[in-house]
Amino acid sequence: MCKGCNQQVKQKELIIPIGPHRGDKIITNYGCICEDIKLAEETKHALYSLKRNRLIDNFNYYSLINNSLKQATIENYNPTSIELNKVKQKVLEYINSFDGEQNLLFTGNCGTGKSHLSISITKKLMEQGYKCLFLSLPKLLTKIKRMYNKGGGIEDELLDIIRQVDLLVIDDIGSEQQTEWSTSKLFEILDDRAGKATIYTTNLSSSELKKRVNERNFSRMMENTEVVVMNGADYRRRDF
Protein backbone atom coordinates (compact mmCIF):
# COMPACT_ATOMS: atom_id res chain seq x y z
CA MET A 1 0.00 0.00 0.00
CA CYS A 2 1.41 3.38 -1.03
CA LYS A 3 1.26 5.85 1.88
CA GLY A 4 1.01 8.77 -0.53
CA CYS A 5 -1.97 7.74 -2.68
CA ASN A 6 -3.41 4.81 -0.67
CA GLN A 7 -3.29 2.56 -3.72
CA GLN A 8 -2.25 -1.08 -3.81
CA VAL A 9 1.27 -1.22 -5.20
CA LYS A 10 3.25 -4.07 -6.68
CA GLN A 11 7.01 -3.82 -6.90
CA LYS A 12 8.87 -5.37 -9.80
CA GLU A 13 12.56 -5.70 -10.44
CA LEU A 14 13.63 -4.70 -13.94
CA ILE A 15 16.98 -4.80 -15.71
CA ILE A 16 17.89 -1.79 -17.83
CA PRO A 17 18.39 -3.23 -21.34
CA ILE A 18 20.34 -0.39 -23.02
CA GLY A 19 22.30 2.78 -22.35
CA PRO A 20 25.12 3.60 -19.94
CA HIS A 21 23.30 1.82 -17.09
CA ARG A 22 22.69 -1.33 -19.11
CA GLY A 23 22.41 -4.34 -16.83
CA ASP A 24 21.59 -2.32 -13.72
CA LYS A 25 18.60 -3.41 -11.68
CA ILE A 26 15.83 -1.00 -10.70
CA ILE A 27 12.70 -1.39 -8.58
CA THR A 28 9.48 0.09 -10.01
CA ASN A 29 6.12 0.54 -8.33
CA TYR A 30 3.07 -0.51 -10.35
CA GLY A 31 -0.25 0.96 -9.22
CA CYS A 32 1.15 4.09 -7.52
CA ILE A 33 -0.55 7.27 -8.76
CA CYS A 34 1.36 9.80 -6.65
CA GLU A 35 2.90 11.40 -9.73
CA ASP A 36 -0.52 11.60 -11.40
CA ILE A 37 -1.97 13.33 -8.33
CA LYS A 38 0.95 15.74 -8.19
CA LEU A 39 0.58 16.57 -11.89
CA ALA A 40 -3.18 17.10 -11.48
CA GLU A 41 -2.61 19.50 -8.55
CA GLU A 42 0.05 21.42 -10.48
CA THR A 43 -2.29 21.69 -13.48
CA LYS A 44 -5.17 22.84 -11.26
CA HIS A 45 -2.97 25.49 -9.64
CA ALA A 46 -1.70 26.69 -13.02
CA LEU A 47 -5.25 26.99 -14.39
CA TYR A 48 -6.36 28.87 -11.26
CA SER A 49 -3.45 31.30 -11.60
CA LEU A 50 -4.20 31.79 -15.29
CA LYS A 51 -7.90 32.45 -14.60
CA ARG A 52 -7.12 34.84 -11.75
CA ASN A 53 -4.59 36.76 -13.85
CA ARG A 54 -7.12 36.99 -16.68
CA LEU A 55 -9.76 38.33 -14.28
CA ILE A 56 -7.34 40.95 -12.98
CA ASP A 57 -6.27 41.93 -16.51
CA ASN A 58 -9.92 42.40 -17.58
CA PHE A 59 -10.68 44.31 -14.39
CA ASN A 60 -7.76 46.68 -14.95
CA TYR A 61 -8.60 47.13 -18.64
CA TYR A 62 -12.31 47.91 -18.30
CA SER A 63 -12.55 49.51 -14.85
CA LEU A 64 -12.54 53.28 -14.38
CA ILE A 65 -10.69 53.91 -11.12
CA ASN A 66 -8.95 56.85 -9.51
CA ASN A 67 -5.25 56.20 -8.97
CA SER A 68 -5.67 56.73 -5.23
CA LEU A 69 -7.81 53.58 -5.03
CA LYS A 70 -5.55 51.17 -6.89
CA GLN A 71 -3.70 50.12 -3.73
CA ALA A 72 -6.83 49.92 -1.58
CA THR A 73 -7.44 46.61 0.23
CA ILE A 74 -9.63 45.46 3.07
CA GLU A 75 -6.47 45.03 5.13
CA ASN A 76 -5.28 48.63 4.77
CA TYR A 77 -8.69 50.18 5.45
CA ASN A 78 -8.39 51.82 8.88
CA PRO A 79 -11.80 52.81 10.28
CA THR A 80 -11.90 56.02 12.30
CA SER A 81 -14.78 55.01 14.57
CA ILE A 82 -16.52 52.03 16.16
CA GLU A 83 -19.37 52.36 13.66
CA LEU A 84 -17.03 52.27 10.67
CA ASN A 85 -15.28 49.25 12.16
CA LYS A 86 -18.69 47.53 12.21
CA VAL A 87 -19.04 48.40 8.53
CA LYS A 88 -15.68 46.77 7.84
CA GLN A 89 -16.90 43.59 9.54
CA LYS A 90 -20.11 43.71 7.49
CA VAL A 91 -18.00 43.92 4.33
CA LEU A 92 -16.05 40.82 5.38
CA GLU A 93 -19.34 39.00 5.95
CA TYR A 94 -20.54 40.07 2.50
CA ILE A 95 -17.38 38.68 0.91
CA ASN A 96 -17.57 35.39 2.79
CA SER A 97 -21.26 34.85 1.99
CA PHE A 98 -21.30 36.31 -1.53
CA ASP A 99 -24.25 34.89 -3.46
CA GLY A 100 -24.10 36.95 -6.65
CA GLU A 101 -27.47 38.62 -5.97
CA GLN A 102 -27.28 40.81 -2.85
CA ASN A 103 -26.69 44.52 -3.51
CA LEU A 104 -25.12 47.11 -1.21
CA LEU A 105 -25.52 50.88 -1.10
CA PHE A 106 -22.74 52.68 0.77
CA THR A 107 -23.90 56.15 1.74
CA GLY A 108 -22.38 58.84 3.94
CA ASN A 109 -20.18 61.90 4.01
CA CYS A 110 -16.93 62.21 2.04
CA GLY A 111 -13.77 60.41 3.08
CA THR A 112 -15.19 57.56 5.16
CA GLY A 113 -13.94 54.84 2.81
CA LYS A 114 -16.98 53.92 0.73
CA SER A 115 -14.98 53.56 -2.48
CA HIS A 116 -12.04 51.99 -0.62
CA LEU A 117 -14.20 49.20 0.79
CA SER A 118 -16.05 48.70 -2.49
CA ILE A 119 -12.91 48.11 -4.52
CA SER A 120 -11.56 45.92 -1.71
CA ILE A 121 -14.60 43.67 -2.15
CA THR A 122 -13.86 43.26 -5.86
CA LYS A 123 -10.26 42.27 -5.15
CA LYS A 124 -11.25 39.62 -2.61
CA LEU A 125 -13.94 38.18 -4.87
CA MET A 126 -11.58 38.02 -7.85
CA GLU A 127 -9.29 35.89 -5.69
CA GLN A 128 -12.24 33.49 -5.46
CA GLY A 129 -12.69 33.47 -9.25
CA TYR A 130 -15.54 35.97 -9.61
CA LYS A 131 -15.65 38.49 -12.46
CA CYS A 132 -15.80 42.06 -11.14
CA LEU A 133 -15.83 45.60 -12.47
CA PHE A 134 -15.44 48.99 -10.75
CA LEU A 135 -16.82 52.05 -12.53
CA SER A 136 -16.99 55.68 -11.52
CA LEU A 137 -20.39 56.62 -12.94
CA PRO A 138 -19.39 60.15 -14.03
CA LYS A 139 -16.31 58.75 -15.81
CA LEU A 140 -18.37 55.96 -17.38
CA LEU A 141 -20.92 58.34 -18.86
CA THR A 142 -18.13 60.58 -20.17
CA LYS A 143 -16.43 57.57 -21.77
CA ILE A 144 -19.66 56.37 -23.41
CA LYS A 145 -20.22 59.82 -24.91
CA ARG A 146 -16.71 59.76 -26.39
CA MET A 147 -17.36 56.31 -27.81
CA TYR A 148 -20.21 57.63 -29.93
CA ASN A 149 -17.63 59.37 -32.11
CA LYS A 150 -15.82 56.05 -32.65
CA GLY A 151 -18.85 53.93 -33.49
CA GLY A 152 -21.14 51.87 -31.28
CA GLY A 153 -19.02 48.72 -31.20
CA ILE A 154 -16.79 49.83 -28.33
CA GLU A 155 -19.76 50.99 -26.26
CA ASP A 156 -21.56 47.70 -26.87
CA GLU A 157 -18.46 45.80 -25.73
CA LEU A 158 -18.30 47.74 -22.46
CA LEU A 159 -22.03 47.37 -21.80
CA ASP A 160 -21.73 43.62 -22.44
CA ILE A 161 -18.99 43.42 -19.80
CA ILE A 162 -21.18 45.41 -17.38
CA ARG A 163 -24.01 42.97 -18.01
CA GLN A 164 -21.90 39.83 -17.55
CA VAL A 165 -19.75 40.46 -14.47
CA ASP A 166 -20.63 38.77 -11.18
CA LEU A 167 -20.20 42.02 -9.25
CA LEU A 168 -20.39 45.58 -10.54
CA VAL A 169 -19.42 48.59 -8.43
CA ILE A 170 -21.01 51.88 -9.50
CA ASP A 171 -19.03 54.53 -7.67
CA ASP A 172 -20.12 58.08 -6.87
CA ILE A 173 -23.65 57.66 -8.18
CA GLY A 174 -25.64 60.87 -8.12
CA SER A 175 -22.65 63.13 -8.76
CA GLU A 176 -22.94 62.84 -12.54
CA GLN A 177 -24.43 65.69 -14.56
CA GLN A 178 -28.16 65.04 -14.77
CA THR A 179 -29.61 65.01 -18.27
CA GLU A 180 -32.33 63.00 -19.94
CA TRP A 181 -29.60 61.01 -21.70
CA SER A 182 -27.64 60.21 -18.52
CA THR A 183 -30.81 59.19 -16.68
CA SER A 184 -31.80 56.91 -19.55
CA LYS A 185 -28.30 55.37 -19.76
CA LEU A 186 -28.29 54.73 -16.01
CA PHE A 187 -31.62 52.93 -16.27
CA GLU A 188 -30.24 50.78 -19.08
CA ILE A 189 -27.31 49.76 -16.86
CA LEU A 190 -29.53 49.10 -13.84
CA ASP A 191 -31.95 47.09 -15.95
CA ASP A 192 -29.13 44.97 -17.35
CA ARG A 193 -27.94 44.27 -13.79
CA ALA A 194 -31.32 43.05 -12.51
CA GLY A 195 -30.77 39.92 -10.40
CA LYS A 196 -26.99 40.39 -10.27
CA ALA A 197 -24.93 41.81 -7.42
CA THR A 198 -24.21 45.52 -7.65
CA ILE A 199 -22.59 47.86 -5.14
CA TYR A 200 -23.37 51.59 -5.18
CA THR A 201 -21.53 54.40 -3.41
CA THR A 202 -22.87 57.91 -2.90
CA ASN A 203 -22.35 60.97 -0.70
CA LEU A 204 -26.07 61.77 -0.94
CA SER A 205 -28.92 60.97 1.41
CA SER A 206 -31.75 58.74 0.18
CA SER A 207 -34.01 61.71 -0.57
CA GLU A 208 -31.21 63.56 -2.37
CA LEU A 209 -30.26 60.49 -4.38
CA LYS A 210 -33.85 59.81 -5.41
CA LYS A 211 -34.14 63.39 -6.63
CA ARG A 212 -30.86 63.17 -8.56
CA VAL A 213 -31.34 59.85 -10.37
CA ASN A 214 -35.18 60.02 -10.55
CA GLU A 215 -37.68 57.79 -8.79
CA ARG A 216 -37.68 55.00 -11.39
CA ASN A 217 -33.91 54.54 -11.25
CA PHE A 218 -33.88 54.84 -7.46
CA SER A 219 -36.57 52.17 -7.15
CA ARG A 220 -34.59 49.83 -9.41
CA MET A 221 -31.43 50.47 -7.37
CA MET A 222 -33.12 49.58 -4.09
CA GLU A 223 -34.29 46.12 -5.20
CA ASN A 224 -32.56 43.55 -2.94
CA THR A 225 -30.24 46.29 -1.66
CA GLU A 226 -28.91 46.72 1.87
CA VAL A 227 -28.12 50.31 2.82
CA VAL A 228 -24.84 50.75 4.71
CA VAL A 229 -24.42 54.17 6.34
CA MET A 230 -20.83 55.42 6.63
CA ASN A 231 -20.62 58.73 8.44
CA GLY A 232 -17.52 59.88 10.28
CA ALA A 233 -14.24 61.72 10.04
CA ASP A 234 -12.45 61.95 6.68
CA TYR A 235 -9.87 59.15 7.04
CA ARG A 236 -7.85 60.59 4.15
CA ARG A 237 -7.21 63.72 6.27
CA ARG A 238 -6.76 62.08 9.66
CA ASP A 239 -3.15 63.32 9.89
CA PHE A 240 -3.95 66.86 8.74
Each language-model region and where it sits:
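A short mid-domain helix/strand-loop element embedded in enzyme catalytic domains
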Residues: 66-71, 87-103
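Walker A/P-loop nucleotide-binding motif
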Residues: 100-118
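A short, basic N-terminal segment
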Residues: 1-80, 84, 227-228, 232, ...
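Surface-exposed cleft-lining segments at the edges of enzyme active sites
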Residues: 78, 107-108, 143-144
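Short glycine-rich substrate-engagement loop in P-loop NTPases that contacts/grips substrate
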Residues: 82-91, 101, 122, 126-164, ...
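Loop/turn-to-beta-strand initiation segments
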Residues: 102, 130-131, 164-168, 194-200
